[in-house]
Regions:
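A short, conserved structural fragment
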Residues: 92-103, 310-311, 338-339
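Short amphipathic alpha-helical interaction segments
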Residues: 78-93
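Flanking helices and flexible, charged tails adjoining ferredoxin-like Fe-S electron-transfer domains
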Residues: 320-374
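Ferredoxin-like iron-sulfur electron-transfer modules
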Residues: 108-110, 247-253, 275-325, 343-346
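Short, amphipathic alpha-helical interaction segments positioned at domain boundaries
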Residues: 105-142
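Short acidic, hydrophobic short linear motifs in intrinsically disordered regions
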Residues: 66-77
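Glycine-centered, phosphate/nucleic-acid-interacting loop/turn motifs that mediate DNA/RNA or nucleotide
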Residues: 95, 243, 299, 308, ...
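Catalytic cores of enzyme domains
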Residues: 141-287
């Protein structure tokens, strides 16, 4: 379907009409497990209009979760093959849609807005995009953050966990690094976004770690700085020293990034500190404990905790309902009085096996049907 006649005579687009391709794309994105709920002020449509042309939004609104070749998409939608392929390639190059290898070439599919489209705009984010995202964040993001299972899961660095304790690879940041073949780091779009809207935080920007099961995966990237495994560990320790919380995608297999987060800029953790949503991030399998003999009540752990999970009177004490098991406080204790131990089994939420399992659980929690996307 051509959109050349869609705008009115003044070149304007009516954002409220049901025929608006941005509205249809927003509705399509909201059928994904991640969610992209409508706002009261139409900020989600303005966001999409900033990133997609009308024609691109129309095409993207008809993509599926599963990958299809450009030929399959063109034939399914009754579109001209060459122009369809060029438009799909352009959107994939800008991180607006998903792409991957198929037996007969490249395939294309629908990509969530978060985590997905938005994070891919690291190279082009400006003040306008930052402010549009903030409008949407304040208006509708609480819905996204309230859906279970959570998008992110906290993992400790590994050294903060009690020795001789069995730890699955997906339960610690070190285990995730060890399972990769390539490592890299890039700037954090969350901290760039808050800086652009005039609310910068003190934490370092070059903190988003990415991994891959493929060797030399980031050798030709313009935005990702390739790292050796040792450099990846050094970056993790640098984040730890900055008091940042390590979080990953909330599944056991396919953890290919480690976000090093703060409650002042991180889109996920701000949900807890700023929006008051309790379960924005899944806790780790561990909880902090205090050795009352070693503790001298200095209070450094209280200052380092981003979740207000510690208090000090005669000695430090832990609020188990607020502690997410990140281990940040463990490294700040000069007397080594803190250590992470495994939570009681009944308190540990099962971690989804993979992205599909995670998605199906969120779909069930939302009560939506994703059959039209398959």
């Amino acid at each position: 379907m051509s959109l050349l006649n869609y705008p009115n005579q003044n070149g304007e687009v009516n954002m409220n009409t049901e025929h608006n391709p941005y509205k249809r794309l927003a509705e399509r994105l909201d059928t994904l497990p991640n969610g992209f709920p409508p706002s009261d002020d139409g900020s989600e449509l303005k966001l999409l209009a900033k990133l997609f042309t009308l024609e691109e939004a129309d095409l993207a609104s008809q993509l599926r979760i599963i990958l299809e070749s450009s030929t399959q998409i063109a034939e399914r939608l009754g579109l001209e093959h060459t122009s369809t392929r060029q438009m799909l390639k352009s959107m994939a190059r800008r991180g607006l849609i998903r792409t991957g290898k198929m037996d007969d070439g490249l395939g294309y599919g629908l990509l969530p807005f978060v985590v997905g489209i938005y994070e891919n705009q690291l190279g082009i984010i400006d003040e306008e995009l930052a402010r549009l995202f903030e409008e949407y964040y304040q208006n509708s993001f609480p819905i996204v953050l309230s859906i279970q299972p959570s998008i992110h899961r906290v993992v400790p660095i590994g050294e903060s966990i009690k020795m001789n304790m069995q730890v699955a690879p997906y339960e610690s940041a070190a285990g995730i690094i060890e399972n990769a073949q390539s490592w890299g780091v890039q700037d954090c779009i969350c901290r760039i976004q808050t800086r652009l809207i005039g609310k910068p935080c003190k934490h370092p920007v070059d903190m988003c770690m990415v991994m891959s099961p493929v060797r030399d995966a980031f050798a030709n990237s313009n935005e990702i700085k390739p790292l050796t495994k040792d450099e990846a560990y050094a970056t993790l320790h640098r984040a730890d020293q900055a008091g940042l919380v390590h979080s990953v995608s909330n599944n056991q297999r396919g953890d290919w990034y480690i976000c090093n987060c703060c409650t002042c800029s991180c889109g996920i953790l701000r949900g807890m500190a700023e929006l008051g949503i309790a379960n924005v991030v899944a806790s780790s399998a561990f909880i902090n404990t205090v050795d009352e003999i070693l503790c001298n009540a200095c209070g450094l752990c209280v200052e380092s905790c981003q979740f207000d999970a510690l208090t000090v009177e005669m000695v430090a004490s832990v609020n188990g309902t607020r502690c997410v098991g990140c281990g940040v406080c463990v490294d700040t204790c000069p007397d080594h009085a803190l250590i992470l131990v495994r939570r009681p089994e009944e308190e540990v939420k099962p971690v989804p096996v993979n992205l599909l399992d995670w998605g199906m659980q969120r779909v069930k929690d939302r009560g939506i049907d994703i059959t039209p996307l398959l």
